[in-house]
Amino acid sequence: MESLRTIGKAIPADVRAVNRRLLLQHVSEGRGRVSRADVVRLTGLNTATVSGLVAEMLEQGLVREVGLGPSIGGKPPILLDLDDRLFTVLGVQLTRDGFRIAALSLRGRIIEAREVVGDSDQIADVLVPAIQEVAASLDRTVLAVGVSVPGIVDHRGLISRSVLLHRDDFDLGGLLTERLGYPVHLINDSDACALAEVALSDDPAPTLMALYVGDGVGAGLVLSGALFQGETFGAGEVGHLNLRTHDLRCACGRTGCLEAAARISVLTGQPQSLQLTPRGERVEGLLDEKAAEHAARNIAALLELVYELIDVRRTVLCGPVCDLGPGLLAHIRDALTENEPYLGGHITVEYSRLGWNGTLLGAAATAAHKELGLLWTMIES
């Protein structure tokens, strides 16, 4: 597992690229309070290397000079900051019924977002023009695109399996890169939520589970600050875990899956995904209380299993489920206490402060990290 908040010094084979990432990360985290001398001290790089890289990034529009720092007996140092004005990364959330697309600054601030109805069977034909339209509306240059998908994204960057999209070994990233002309990077939707939660966290090495509940159900696991994806990148595929609490038929064809009891359409009693409802409106009234109680028992059973297995105590619910109000959380907490009173005081469950936007932010964060080495911290909630 690679820490999501640590970038080490380079090995000889990739010295320049890694040193650029190291410098840019420290400048970004400094938020206008670091000078070239500070970067030398923080990174351990020599003065000539830092001066050369800063000059290069100033010319490219990635870094800017923002003023003078306090003098310590000599010439005041020139302070540096990430230049957040010229570039954007795009985040895309892919669902069964359509897409959400957002343009974000290099600090993770959402500049523009929109929803697009589309058939997942024709992903590229719908998504490519939508991305091109968003890009054309901006006065910034697109560096890269991050796409969150409901399925396993393997080490090759392929969708190795997605029940909801009915795809196996699908090179969506390669297809989009070819048609768009931008680098495109894929990430599992629950892993994207987990990345966003790490960026929000005050803890430099948090341990948590981001449980995405939308068309499907999945978990993103962060252990001591590192995203855990497993040997074949399938860690967190809990939607088709059979907890033996019901016999409902799942989209995968089996019965008893967590997803069959807890996906958003079951919780609301609505056949269509909540992803396509108007934004900015609370929808507590859509929560089906009977279904919510049943889903809560299944979710509580999962939280208990994860706690007992790997000692993850904090769970953050992400995705469309965040719009369902406090009722579902209360049912989950009650179920935890009923199962084992001890657990009620040791397992915490809450909605993400990012709401729906966590998946988009995590997808865009993936693009920013892959292209520039930036690890977002203190993103806006």
Placement of each model-derived feature along the sequence:
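Short glycine-rich anion-binding loops that position phosphate/pyrophosphate groups of nucleotides
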Residues: 69, 150-153, 214-216, 321-322
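ATP-binding/phosphotransfer module of carbohydrate and carboxylate kinases, centering on a glycine-rich
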Residues: 1-68, 72-117, 121-141, 201-202, ...
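Glycine-rich phosphate-binding loop of actin/hexokinase-like ATP-binding domains
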Residues: 205-261
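Acidic-glycine-rich active-site phosphate/pyrophosphate-binding loop
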Residues: 173-174, 228-230, 235-243, 333-343
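Glycine-rich phosphate-binding loop and adjoining helix at the ATP-binding site
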Residues: 110-207, 327-338
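Short, acidic, Ser/Thr-enriched surface-loop or helix-capping motifs
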Residues: 105, 154, 222
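Active-site nucleophile and cofactor-binding loops and adjacent substrate-binding regions
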Residues: 43, 163-165, 185-191, 212, ...
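General beta-strand structural signal in soluble alpha/beta enzymes
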Residues: 65-66, 184-188, 221
